[in-house]
């Protein structure tokens, strides 16, 4: 597996690559643009070329793009849905420009219209995006904690969407551990991980998971709450993370941490903790 973090855009992506290298990261996730804006980030050929050159030099791969939080492919409001389609299209194009194989997105909320209606609207949105899909980029639908009318708390919801496009092979899943815990998927120890992965394989298919967001959380299991915590400071436990991430279905994945940035050395501490948990502490 390759371990890394979600990194802020401040200072430019080149600066973040250098920071990632200093910390010993092997992959990186960044936003495709301002996470709270409907305006997509611009692609500047010069900065893109410098980034790709630096990425190759440092061997920090893969680069994963995360879409802005505003996207709601399930919105019953046409204007919100159309803006979401536009923003997601821009993220996919940016990923192609930067040689990034994956774009991670939250699919959104049905806003009280019901799960099936929400799934239909997501499928409609993706059909529109499929009309001009950039080659070499895969869209990963992220599971959620299942709060309110948000889609993706149950992996079966993601599977229903992905199955509608089974012939395209451009859709997969990003599995977030904190979100899974909030949605009721217990991954706190070896036994529970084995049971949960059997369920995940049944509901979704382990082969569809291409990226893992490794985040601890201190919310109660099945609470539908979404709060990220530092590795080792929540309810998932070292045993749970170790059993999950060293499972055969997860070892080839890019593992991205989205842990709190509330200290200058918190990323370094989280990285070393996770390395130790998965049996790579000898690299320290």
Swiss-Prot record:
Its EC number is 3.1.21.2. Binds 3 Zn(2+) ions. Keywords: DNA damage, DNA repair, Endonuclease, Hydrolase, Metal-binding, Nuclease, Zinc. Zn(2+) 2 binds at residues 142, 176, 213, 258. It is an enzyme of class 3 (hydrolase). Disulfide bonds: none annotated. CDD domains: AP2Ec. Zn(2+) 1 binds at residues 66, 106, 142. Zn(2+) 3 binds at residues 179, 226, 228. One of its GO terms (molecular function) is DNA binding. Pfam families: AP_endonuc_2 (PF01261). GO terms for biological process: base-excision repair. InterPro entries: AP_endonuc_2 (IPR001719), Xyl_isomerase-like_sf (IPR036237), Xyl_isomerase-like_TIM-brl (IPR013022). It comes from the Bacteria. SUPFAM superfamilies: Xylose isomerase-like (SSF51658). It catalyses: Endonucleolytic cleavage to 5'-phosphooligonucleotide end-products. Its cofactor is Zn(2+). PANTHER family: APURINIC-APYRIMIDINIC ENDONUCLEASE, ENDONUCLEASE IV ENDODEOXYRIBONUCLEASE IV. Belongs to the AP endonuclease 2 family. Endonuclease IV plays a role in DNA repair. It cleaves phosphodiester bonds at apurinic or apyrimidinic (AP) sites, generating a 3'-hydroxyl group and a 5'-terminal sugar phosphate. This is Probable endonuclease 4. The gene is nfo.
């Amino acid at each position: 597996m390759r371990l890394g973090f979600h990194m802020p855009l401040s200072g430019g992506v080149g600066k973040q690559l250098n920071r990632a290298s200093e910390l010993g990261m092997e992959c990186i996730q960044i936003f495709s643009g301002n996470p709270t804006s409907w305006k997509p980030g611009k692609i500047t050929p010069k900065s893109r070329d410098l980034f790709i050159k630096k990425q190759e030099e440092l061997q920090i791969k893969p680069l994963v793009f995360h879409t802005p939080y505003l996207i709601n492919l399930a919105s019953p409001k046409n204007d919100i849905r159309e803006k979401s389609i536009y923003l997601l299209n821009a993220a996919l194009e940016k990923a192609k420009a930067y040689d990034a194989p994956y774009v991670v997105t939250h699919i959104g909320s049905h806003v009280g219209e019901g799960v099936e209606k929400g799934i239909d609207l997501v499928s409609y949105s993706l059909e529109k995006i499929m009309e001009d899909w950039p080659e070499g980029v895969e869209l990963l639908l992220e599971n959620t904690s299942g709060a309110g009318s948000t889609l993706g708390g149950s992996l079966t919801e993601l599977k229903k969407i992905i199955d509608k496009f089974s012939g395209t092979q451009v859709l997969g899943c990003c599995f977030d551990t904190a979100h899974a815990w909030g949605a009721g998927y217990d991954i706190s120890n070896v036994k529970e991980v084995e049971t949960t992965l059997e369920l995940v394989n049944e509901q979704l298919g382990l082969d569809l998971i291409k990226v893992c967001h490794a985040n601890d959380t201190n919310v109660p299991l099945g609470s539908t709450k979404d709060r990220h915590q530092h590795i080792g400071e929540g309810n998932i436990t070292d045993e749970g993370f170790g059993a999950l991430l060293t499972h055969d279905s997860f070892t080839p994945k890019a593992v991205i941490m989205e842990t709190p940035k509330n200290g200058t050395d918190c990323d370094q501490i989280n990285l070393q903790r996770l390395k130790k948990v998965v049996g790579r502490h000898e690299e320290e």
